[in-house]
């Protein structure tokens, strides 16, 4: 009950291999439970070594080690953050980059607690200092772009990229880090990095991720955005698309600009929103499945051509290389030296795979931005701070409920500008297309290649995001803008086919939550407009019986709500007595047995809807002994709210539960009159 924020997902993080194979292998074989912390102790000790190359390899080994969750407690015990922090300002640029890579992985793999601990251990001081040094270095660096490209080793831009990723991860998990970001003037620095998007899109993408994080719910930072800063974002937003990575950059910048909507002048709002949704429409209009197929074929052909060329070269020059010992020695030395550079420690990523991942990530991000556009701000905790889950709050709740005409929270709404742009750019149609299962040929290609296999999960995630988007749009747009009643019935059939085409749908929790959310919104809209529903009661009961056993609270809330919507429609029809009895018994069982108050409250709401009116509903309520069951449960529900509510549920959830408690009292009184009338 209540809106939940869309989740954000990080990109795959830095994972070193290469010249530091010994350290990496030791890290991979180590366990966090050893008394001496295994490889952790040795690697941390090497961070103090006089040799820069040893320090670099130790950092790379730690970057690999922190990806193993059992190793994290040992690293925390040995104060890894305080030991790595100073290396961000090491005299060696190579050490700086690998130290930042290790901290990047630590912040990504450790989660909220580790990131908060990193802030406590003052990682932000050397991190901000390194950001500023990189900025100054970029200003003073007069090498030509071609020289920089050829050098491609331990460059300032590479260090800046790793540093921004650490900053992004920490700010995503720690409000204290965001506060430091604000106070230390980091915005100006990262915007300078963003300005390099024409020549370094990787750095610009990292900055855009970071900006999208720090601009969310951060009014203090919004004051720091000057006209120059906004112009920089605009130039990145409107830049030509030269690759899928540049398209991802534009999408992330669009998300940042949406976060800044409160400081955009009113006269420019429509133009800006139009520009944002034009880009999101372009991203969603691309066929990701076809892209996967084309890029995989291109990679196969490129590797085949390269292998043939290498074989010809070996056949031509093999004898000369064997005979020329001196040249062989030089060649060997070069190969060994080349492996010590940090860029060789990064996992090799083929250009086709990078392009494909960029498109999939852009589409996922675009869908998440649209969901955010469709959501009201979360209710403030302060708004309900004085409410308590006690009987004394009932009078206040009843007055508030009456004043709002029976609606506790304001409904979701779209601004005219967003509404117009969504429909003009055919966003609903494109989102509908994304709800289909991923291209089977693309999935098959990816499943047969280890480096491409993770893309299957990304394609499935896009489908789930599209279903959540569909939920928002169905709730917000007029039926006419969704294509009319016939289109909604077609959509219901489509969702039904998606759901029941998978016999084991209950095992796919993310998919089940997304599709049940979309179905809930769709059935609610159809019921409110008296549009006949296409799913049979038996199909809905199959969904609900599977969903109610899910560990995901959102799934359980959705299925009981779906039953409530369906039951309220059936209650007005003749010949539905047995179905209503089944629905009532199911909802009563959920009400009394589900461990979550949120689910129990939703089930009570559903009971109120189903048995509020109609002759068949009245007969069913008597036969399942609804009144006595609710009377018995009422004191239990009050007690559970009082004992379990505080600390386990948010203030807006508690407010809704108080509302359900009040309605339960009303509903029992109503059922008493029904029972008297029918039994007298």
UniProtKB/Swiss-Prot annotation:
Alphabetic keyword roster: Diamond-Blackfan anemia, Disease variant, Erythrocyte maturation, Phosphoprotein, Repeat, Ribosome biogenesis
Residue span of region Disordered: 1-39
Alphabetized GO MF terms: unfolded protein binding
SUPFAM superfamilies for the chain: ARM repeat
Name of the protein this chain belongs to: HEAT repeat-containing protein 3
Family recorded in the similarity comment: Belongs to the nuclear import and ribosome assembly adapter family.
CDD domains xrefs: Syo1_like
Source domain of life: Eukaryota
InterPro entries membership: ARM-like, ARM-type_fold, Nuclear_Import_Ribosome_Adapt
Coiled coil: none
Compositionally skewed regions (Basic residues) per UniProt: 1-11
């Amino acid at each position: 009950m209540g809106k939940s924020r869309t989740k954000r997902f990080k990109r795959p993080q830095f994972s070193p291999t290469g010249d530091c194979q010994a350290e990496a292998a030791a890290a991979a074989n180590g366990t966090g439970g050893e008394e001496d912390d295994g490889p952790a102790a040795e690697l941390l000790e090497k961070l103090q070594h006089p040799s820069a190359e040893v320090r670099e390899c130790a950092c790379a080994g730690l970057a690999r080690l922190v990806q193993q969750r059992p190793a994290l407690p040992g690293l925390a015990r040995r104060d890894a953050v305080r030991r790595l922090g100073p290396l961000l300002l090491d005299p060696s640029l190579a050490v700086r980059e690998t130290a930042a890579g290790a901290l990047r992985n630590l912040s990504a793999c450790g989660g909220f607690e580790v990131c908060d601990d990193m802030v406590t251990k003052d990682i932000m001081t050397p991190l901000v200092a390194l950001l500023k040094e990189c900025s100054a270095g970029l200003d003073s660096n007069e090498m030509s772009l071609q020289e920089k490209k050829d050098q491609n080793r331990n460059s300032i831009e590479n260090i800046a990229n790793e540093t921004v990723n650490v900053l992004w991860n920490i700010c995503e998990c720690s409000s204290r880090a965001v506060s430091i970001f604000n106070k230390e003037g980091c915005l100006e620095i990262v915007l300078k990095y963003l300005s390099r998007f024409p020549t370094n899109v990787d750095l610009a993408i990292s900055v855009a991720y970071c900006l999208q994080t720090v601009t969310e719910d951060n009014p203090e930072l919004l004051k720091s955005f000057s006209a120059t800063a906004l112009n920089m974002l605009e130039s990145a937003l409107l830049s030509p698309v030269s690759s899928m990575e540049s398209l991802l950059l534009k999408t992330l910048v669009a998300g940042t600009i949406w976060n800044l909507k409160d400081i955009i002048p009113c006269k420019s709002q429509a133009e800006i929103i139009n520009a944002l949704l034009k880009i999101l429409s372009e991203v969603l209009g691309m066929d990701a499945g076809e892209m996967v197929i084309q890029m995989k074929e291109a990679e196969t052909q490129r590797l085949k051509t390269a292998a043939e060329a290498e074989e010809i070269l070996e056949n031509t020059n093999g004898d000369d290389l064997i005979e020329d010992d001196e040249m062989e020695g030089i060649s060997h030395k070069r190969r060994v030296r080349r492996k010590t550079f940090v860029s060789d420690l990064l996992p090799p990523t083929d250009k086709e795979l990078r392009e494909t991942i960029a498109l999939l990530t852009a589409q996922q991000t675009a869908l998440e931005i649209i969901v955010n556009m469709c959501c009201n701000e979360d209710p403030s905790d302060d708004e309900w701070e004085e409410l308590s889950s006690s009987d004394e709050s009932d009078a206040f709740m009843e007055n508030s409920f009456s004043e709002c005409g029976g609606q506790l929270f304001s409904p979701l709404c779209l601004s005219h500008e967003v509404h117009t742009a969504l429909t003009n750019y055919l966003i609903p149609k494109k989102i509908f297309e994304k709800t289909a299962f991923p291209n089977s040929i693309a999935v098959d290609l990816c499943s047969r290649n280890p480096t491409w296999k993770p893309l299957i999960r990304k394609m499935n995630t896009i489908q789930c995001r599209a279903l959540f988007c569909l939920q928002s749009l169905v709730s917000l747009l007029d039926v006419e803008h969704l294509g009319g009643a016939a289109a909604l019935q077609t959509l219901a059939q489509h969702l039904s086919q998606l759901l029941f085409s998978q016999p084991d749908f209950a095992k796919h929790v993310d998919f089940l939550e997304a599709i049940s959310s979309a179905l809930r919104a769709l059935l609610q809209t159809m019921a409110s407009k008296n549009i006949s529903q296409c799913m049979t009661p038996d199909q809905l009961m199959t969904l609900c019986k599977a969903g109610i056993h899910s560990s995901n609270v959102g799934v359980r809330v959705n299925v009981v709500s779906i039953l409530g919507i369906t039951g309220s429609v059936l209650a007005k029809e003749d010949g539905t007595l047995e179905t209503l009895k089944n629905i009532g018994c199911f909802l009563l069982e959920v009400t009394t047995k589900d461990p979550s108050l949120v689910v129990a409250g939703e089930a009570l709401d559903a009971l109120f809807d189903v048995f509020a009116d109609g002759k068949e509903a009245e007969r069913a309520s008597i036969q399942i002994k609804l009144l006595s069951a609710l009377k018995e449960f009422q004191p239990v529900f009050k007690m559970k709210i009082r004992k379990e509510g505080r600390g386990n549920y948010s203030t807006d959830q508690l407010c809704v539960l108080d509302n359900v408690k009040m309605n339960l009292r009303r509903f029992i009184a109503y059922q008493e009159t029904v029972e008297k009338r029918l039994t007298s």
